[in-house]
């Protein structure tokens, strides 16, 4: 069975987080990984260059030098290691897994909140507090989605859980109950 990027990403991320903690470099590594993610988002072809046989070794070395020039030793080693083992394309998944582990360590939960209208600052703050308390975390990173089709109420998605208190959801449940036997 082939090992996929999604399978190896948590292993690399965990090892990187532990090494960063040992060297008291967690914030530095986190910031550098966010910058790398931006580079990959802007230039997705970078992820395939090291697997491309038509690109010379000198060009690959030049790219690696550019990528690692301002990086901390931990991030530079991650880049070199993933390139060496043919896992450079896994870097977005590794960064995502690192971010999840980083948030977990920091007591931050990411949540997506869907409402019919935009939340006020006070409402968003109240939801952040409620979600953090519900999941036993310190704070909530809130992604707000406005979807008029929910009619009213709120749908919260966090850690694979969905708490749906929307009017549309209630209507759908009533409709299903009425149509049942």
From Swiss-Prot:
Record-level GO cellular component terms: plasma membrane; proton-transporting ATP synthase complex
Q: NCBIfam families of this UniProt entry? A: ATP_synt_delta (TIGR01145)
**What keywords is this UniProt entry annotated with?**
ATP synthesis, Cell membrane, CF(1), Hydrogen ion transport, Ion transport, Membrane, Transport
A single Gene Ontology molecular function, please?
A: proton-transporting ATP synthase activity, rotational mechanism
User: PANTHER family recorded for this chain?
Assistant: ATP SYNTHASE DELTA CHAIN
User: Where does the record say this protein resides?
Assistant: Cell membrane
Which InterPro entries does UniProt cross-reference here?
Answer: ATP_synth_OSCP/delta_N_sf, ATPase_OSCP/dsu
Q: Which family does it belong to?
A: Belongs to the ATPase delta chain family.
Q: What is the lineage of its organism?
A: Bacteria, Bacillati, Bacillota, Bacilli, Lactobacillales
Primary localisation category: membrane
Pfam families in the record, alphabetically? OSCP
- Quaternary structure? F-type ATPases have 2 components, F(1) - the catalytic core - and F(0) - the membrane proton channel. F(1) has five subunits: alpha(3), beta(3), gamma(1), delta(1), epsilon(1). F(0) has three main subunits: a(1), b(2) and c(10-14). The alpha and beta chains form an alternating ring which encloses part of the gamma chain. F(1) is attached to F(0) by a central stalk formed by the gamma and epsilon chains, while a peripheral stalk is formed by the delta and b chains.
Question: What is the protein name for this chain?
Answer: ATP synthase subunit delta
Q: What does this protein do?
A: F(1)F(0) ATP synthase produces ATP from ADP in the presence of a proton or sodium gradient. F-type ATPases consist of two structural domains, F(1) containing the extramembraneous catalytic core and F(0) containing the membrane proton channel, linked together by a central stalk and a peripheral stalk. During catalysis, ATP synthesis in the catalytic domain of F(1) is coupled via a rotary mechanism of the central stalk subunits to proton translocation. This protein is part of the stalk that links CF(0) to CF(1). It either transmits conformational changes from CF(0) to CF(1) or is implicated in proton conduction.
What is the protein's membrane topology class?
Peripheral membrane protein
* Species name: Lacticaseibacillus paracasei (strain ATCC 334 / BCRC 17002 / CCUG 31169 / CIP 107868 / KCTC 3260 / NRRL B-441) (Lactobacillus paracasei)
